[in-house]
């Protein structure tokens, strides 16, 4: 891919017009047009500005293959997008082996794709971002015949969201492992297949819609955690001293309690602020500590 093609792709992915990009970089719209039609090339100063704006290396901008190793992974692709006001995030990521979603104090949405096996990761996985009023759509597209099975075997995703600009998050993805950390949102809805979940710092209403049997390790949570399942058996592990209200809704659902691997009496606290809730039908939730 040439620099002209890459620049146009990055601009469109970021939802910017040529005028907006020119304003951000500090050049004229005509300069952007020349760059995108391969009739001119930017100075290094402007290349660095573009690199910083889009969160890619200069080598990637110029169409050169990056050989830099990433700690723990052989292949990496990073997409960043500036967020300036509170948003509702609609995130569709398809399949992956592992997903970590975190909140942080910055002002960028960051999607980091990592793999040890997908050598053409940057070409085969593209993150599309659509920014409309009050809403940010993030869509991971698989290209060049990359299958869901290959992604679920070899792809790790790290999603960082700016806590100050989060209203609501809808997350659709199929993974083996999901980790949620240091995130604050009015509501986070997870929809998809998942086997192992770790919640290590979440504030708000968390809902997991999955019909798979799950193991959920909830270490730190303020707010509520709701399971919406059909014909599933899941286990929720809580730390000692974690106070919560347990609620059972839906049809034919059952709540059970365990301590040290043995069945126990209900140890929930009706006066607690945090709520654990089972919805759906014909499902069982074991709450353990």
Question: Residue spans of the language-model regions?
Answer:
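DNA major-groove recognition helix of helix-turn-helix/homeodomain DNA-binding modules
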Residues: 45-60
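Short acidic/polar N-terminal linker immediately downstream of export determinants
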Residues: 13, 64-109, 113-120, 149-153, ...
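Conserved hydrophobic/aromatic packing and binding residues within compact polymer-binding modules
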Residues: 7, 21-22, 32-35, 61
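Right-handed parallel beta-helix
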Residues: 80-88, 98, 120-203, 264-289
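Recognition helix of helix-turn-helix/homeodomain-like DNA-binding domains
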Residues: 27-41, 64-66
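Short, surface-exposed interaction patches in beta-rich subdomains
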Residues: 141, 200-289
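Short basic helix-loop element that most often maps to the first helix and adjoining turn
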Residues: 5-24
């Amino acid at each position: 891919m040439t620099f002209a093609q890459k620049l146009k792709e990055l601009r469109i992915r970021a939802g910017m017009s040529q005028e907006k990009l020119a304003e951000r970089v500090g050049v004229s719209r005509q300069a952007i047009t020349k760059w995108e039609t391969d009739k001119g090339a930017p100075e290094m100063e402007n290349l660095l500005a573009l690199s910083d704006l889009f969160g890619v290396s200069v080598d990637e901008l110029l169409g050169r293959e990056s050989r830099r190793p990433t700690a723990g992974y052989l292949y990496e692709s990073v997409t960043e997008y500036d967020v300036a006001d509170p948003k509702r995030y609609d995130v569709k990521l398809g399949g992956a082996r592992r997903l970590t979603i975190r909140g942080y104090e910055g002002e960028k949405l960051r999607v980091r794709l990592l793999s040890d096996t997908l050598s053409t990761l940057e070409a085969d996985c593209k993150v599309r971002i659509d920014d409309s009023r009050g809403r940010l759509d993030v869509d991971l597209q698989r290209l060049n015949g990359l299958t869901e099975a290959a992604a679920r075997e070899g792809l790790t995703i790290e999603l960082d969201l700016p806590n100050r600009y989060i209203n609501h998050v809808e997350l659709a993805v199929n993974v083996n492992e999901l980790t949620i950390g240091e995130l604050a949102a009015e509501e986070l809805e997870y929809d998809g297949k998942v086997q192992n979940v770790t919640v290590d710092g979440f504030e708000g209403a968390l809902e997991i819609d999955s019909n798979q049997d799950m193991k959920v390790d909830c270490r730190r949570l303020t707010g509520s955690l709701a399971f919406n399942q059909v014909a599933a058996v899941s286990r929720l592990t809580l730390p000692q001293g974690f106070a919560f209200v347990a609620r059972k809704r839906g049809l034919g659902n059952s709540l059970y309690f365990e301590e040290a691997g043995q069945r126990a009496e209900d140890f929930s606290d009706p006066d607690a602020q945090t709520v654990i809730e089972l919805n759906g039908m014909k499902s069982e939730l074991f709450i353990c500590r």
